[in-house]
Regions:
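Cytochrome P450
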Residues: 2-163
Length: 163
């Protein structure tokens, strides 16, 4: 869980640099932090996929997946589905959440037990970042992606505080 939260915060710093109007909204109204966390989880979650095993034969779109087969669920793709999320490649902390739901922590019996803790840690971190870096730039030349297949994010996010 610690790995995913730190990657979410790094993803947030880069995403808000790409969408400074959204960072400005948070600066003006910190009550939007929980919604921002949900949108960040949709926009670029640290967990981009999940693997499940079929318990029986399943037929989807004319293709049968046999029982006991591994299935790769690309949740990162699902959260960018334009049928569920208008303008899905845009970070929008005021996004309507009635249609699409958050798959970042799994779903149903496979939901992450640490989801509430991760959300709380992320809220605390964003609140602190608003104090520490109200205006900033990301040094894109110094960005480094993690070399992990199960977690998506940055191992290095150099920032420069604007004064």
């Amino acid at each position: 869980g610690a790995e995913t939260v730190t990657k979410l915060i790094g993803n947030a710093i880069v995403a808000f640099a790409d969408f400074p109007d959204q960072w400005q909204k948070l600066r003006e109204d910190r009550s939007k932090i929980p919604a921002a966390i949900e949108e960040l989880l949709r926009y670029e979650a640290p967990s981009q996929y999940q693997v499940r095993t079929t318990t029986r034969d399943v037929t989807l779109h004319g293709i049968t997946i046999p029982a006991d087969s591994a299935v790769l669920l690309l949740t990162a793709s699902a959260t960018r589905d334009e049928r569920m999320f208008p303008d899905p490649d845009r970070l929008d902390i005021d996004r309507e959440r009635k249609m699409g739901f958050n798959l970042a922590f799994g779903y149903g019996v496979h939901s992450c037990l640490g989801a509430a803790l991760a959300r709380m840690e992320s809220r605390i971190a964003l609140d602190a970042l608003l104090d520490l870096l109200p205006d900033y730039d990301v040094d894109r030349a110094g960005l480094k992606r993690v070399a992990m297949s199960n977690v998506a994010g940055w191992s290095n996010v150099p920032v420069r505080k604007r004064v």
